[in-house]
């Protein structure tokens, strides 16, 4: 995630959210019921329809609840680096983190992109944790259909030791070349 996504306008986040998040009876009621409107802030970067428009911002709709919960806690503790997400996550109470994770987990993953013709040879290792077709499971999140730019950046950060919240991923990504990681990201984003 780009750390300047919201931080330059953090004080005006409510205004941005109001302008960016279309208020309809359905989604306004859902957001109000779950977190008193705090979910509206998420839509500024992560997209109001589940498809982020900003570079480097991941799709979070439809991810596993336990994965979202883990990531929010890691942002709160500073175990996962992002100035923007830390500012947002620390403003969620423990009573709000669970409902936020549950809310996004119940949302429908955005429609698939165009799949590449064949997977790169390095893809086989991913299915061990991320499940066949990379739909995710208990131990690892869904990757299929995730944004290309987010995947490339996450893989790079794991490979360079900048993202430290999964030692397993760091080891795997360090063993894969940058060009192979890009090929993997291109394939995964098209699933």
Where is each model-derived feature located?
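Electrostatic cytochrome c docking/interface patches
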Residues: 22-39, 48-56, 96-123, 141
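Bacterial N-terminal signal peptides
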Residues: 10-22
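The canonical Cys-X-X-Cys-His
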Residues: 42-49, 100, 123-133, 184
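Extracytoplasmic/secreted proteins, especially bacterial periplasmic and envelope-associated proteins
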Residues: 67, 84-87, 99, 121, ...
């Amino acid at each position: 995630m780009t750390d300047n996504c919201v931080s330059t306008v953090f004080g005006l986040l409510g205004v941005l959210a109001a302008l960016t998040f279309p208020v309809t009876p359905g989604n306004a009621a859902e957001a109000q019921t779950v977190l008193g409107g705090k979910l509206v802030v998420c839509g500024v970067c992560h997209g109001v329809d589940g498809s982020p428009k900003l570079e480097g911002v991941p799709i979070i709709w439809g991810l596993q609840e336990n994965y979202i919960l883990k990531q929010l806690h890691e942002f709160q503790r500073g175990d996962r680096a992002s100035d923007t997400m830390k500012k947002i996550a620390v403003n969620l109470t423990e009573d709000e983190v669970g409902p936020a994770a549950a809310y996004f987990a119940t949302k429908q993953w955005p429609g698939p992109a165009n799949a590449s013709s064949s997977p790169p040879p390095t893809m086989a290792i991913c299915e061990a944790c991320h499940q066949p077709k990379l739909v995710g499971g208990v131990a690892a999140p869904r990757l299929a259909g995730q944004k290309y730019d987010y995947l490339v950046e996450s893989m790079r950060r794991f490979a360079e030791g900048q993202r430290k919240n999964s030692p397993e991923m760091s080891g795997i990504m360090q063993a894969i070349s940058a060009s192979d990681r890009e090929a993997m990201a291109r394939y995964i984003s098209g699933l």
